[in-house]
């Protein structure tokens, strides 16, 4: 009888993942693509329901992922080297969870095999976001949805 092999995210640290493994950790929730506001007094990060102009509001996927940094220069590309700084990511984010020594949730596509689970479980904001072109930046505070960290 063959020994059970643990999934890669349980066997490897973030800095040991290959590019395909790293990308597969993304659950497709799109929350990292929401506009965020930082409290200047305590550094808290607040998520708004206002999405980056490249984010598809229904699928929660970037419409130009490969070239996103050309269109949105301040788009943050997550890397394993930044793992210690992932507190600003949503508490459900696989990158943050693994960086904090936690496991993936049961609804994560790598665990359940269903990429739609993140939407069915309402982890994503699919259908509940606004495009940044629809809201003046001065009004973003009116659209806060949660605090990270």
UniProtKB/Swiss-Prot annotation:
Belongs to the UPF0260 family. Signal peptide: none annotated. InterPro entries: Puta_zinc/iron-chelating_dom, UCP006173. This is UPF0260 protein Avin_32930. It holds the Pfam family CxxCxxCC.
């Amino acid at each position: 009888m063959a020994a059970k092999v643990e999934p890669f995210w349980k066997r490897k640290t973030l800095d040991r993942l290959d590019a395909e493994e790293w990308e597969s950790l993304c659950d497709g929730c799109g929350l990292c693509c929401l506009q965020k506001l930082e409290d200047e007094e305590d550094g808290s990060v607040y998520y708004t329901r206002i999405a980056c102009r490249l984010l598809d509001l229904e699928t929660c996927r970037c419409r130009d992922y490969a070239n996103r940094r050309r269109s949105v220069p301040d788009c943050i590309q997550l890397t394993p080297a930044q793992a210690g700084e992932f507190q600003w990511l949503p508490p459900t984010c696989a990158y943050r969870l693994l960086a904090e020594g936690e496991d993936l949730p049961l609804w994560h596509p790598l665990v359940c095999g269903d990429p739609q689970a993140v939407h069915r479980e309402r982890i994503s904001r699919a259908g509940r976001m606004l495009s940044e072109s629809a809201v003046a930046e001065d009004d973003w505070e009116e659209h806060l949805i949660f605090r990270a960290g």
